[in-house]
């Protein structure tokens, strides 16, 4: 098991560009009412930095570990989804929804199906059903089905992220904690989007959505550093190209 102190020392410097790009987004705070390619670039920049964060561990690392590669591709789809959502009021919300749906499928595949953790899945399934029931009165047309499918996909991703989470004992791994925390924050971010769009105005919605979203993506990217595939001895942070 890698200690949190080792994680901070090893991975912290690689995340500096991400933190700087996130600060740029919040400092500039470009108005969402005036979408442009500049605002799309500023919004996507932190995700681009997470691409670089994973690439900093070496292309051979990504090629050797399918879970890390899946998370990287998921980040690519997320950036495309972010760009689409810049123009969501111009008919591109569904496009963004599709991109993030694909990202969640990729993340779920990266987290794997072992252990199964059926009880965790049942709890998440019930909670996601309640969330959809809350959203349902505000949905109409195709969104009635699109949002339902999206809720199912992000809930499945959350289940797989938290299935292997162990907080005590020798089997504890910080990467599983990062995956579980990232999934929870992603669900919170997207639930806020849905409530704000379909149900009622959420105070400070944009700040809440983007802060939880960037934190979620960072944690999910961080979870890829220690591979989930057994390759001889456990993969350690010292491995780099």
Curated annotation (Swiss-Prot):
The chain crosses the membrane at residues 14-30, 37-59, 68-87, 97-113, 120-136, 143-159, 177-195, 207-225. One of its GO terms (molecular function) is alkenylglycerophosphocholine hydrolase activity. Induction: Sterol-inducible in the macrophages and the induction is mediated by the liver X receptor (LXR). Up-regulated by high-fat diet in the white adipose tissue. It is found in: Endoplasmic reticulum membrane. Changing residue 82 to V: Reduced lysoplasmalogenase activity. Highly expressed in the jejunum, white adipose tissue, kidney and macrophages. Its EC number is 3.3.2.2. Pfam families: YhhN. Keywords: Endoplasmic reticulum, Hydrolase, Lipid metabolism, Membrane, Transmembrane, Transmembrane helix. InterPro entries: TMEM86B-like. GO terms for cellular component: endoplasmic reticulum membrane. It is a multi-pass membrane protein. It catalyses: a 1-O-(1Z-alkenyl)-sn-glycero-3-phosphocholine + H2O = a 2,3-saturated aldehyde + sn-glycerol 3-phosphocholine; a 1-O-(1Z-alkenyl)-sn-glycero-3-phosphoethanolamine + H2O = a 2,3-saturated aldehyde + sn-glycero-3-phosphoethanolamine. Residues 1-13, 60-67, 114-119, 160-176, 226-241 are cytoplasmic. Its main location: endoplasmic reticulum. Disruption phenotype: Adipocyte-specific knockout mice show elevated levels of lysoplasmalogens in adipose tissue and enhanced PKA-signaling pathway and mitochondrial oxidative metabolism in adipose tissue. Residues 31-36, 88-96, 137-142, 196-206 are extracellular. GO terms for biological process: lipid metabolic process. Changing residue 190 to V: Reduced lysoplasmalogenase activity. The keyword Magnesium does not apply. Catalyzes the hydrolysis of the vinyl ether bond of choline or ethanolamine lysoplasmalogens, forming fatty aldehyde and glycerophosphocholine or glycerophosphoethanolamine, respectively and is specific for the sn-2-deacylated (lyso) form of plasmalogen. Plays an important role in lysoplasmalogen metabolism in the adipocyte tissue and macrophages. Belongs to the TMEM86 family. This is Lysoplasmalogenase TMEM86A. It comes from Mus musculus.
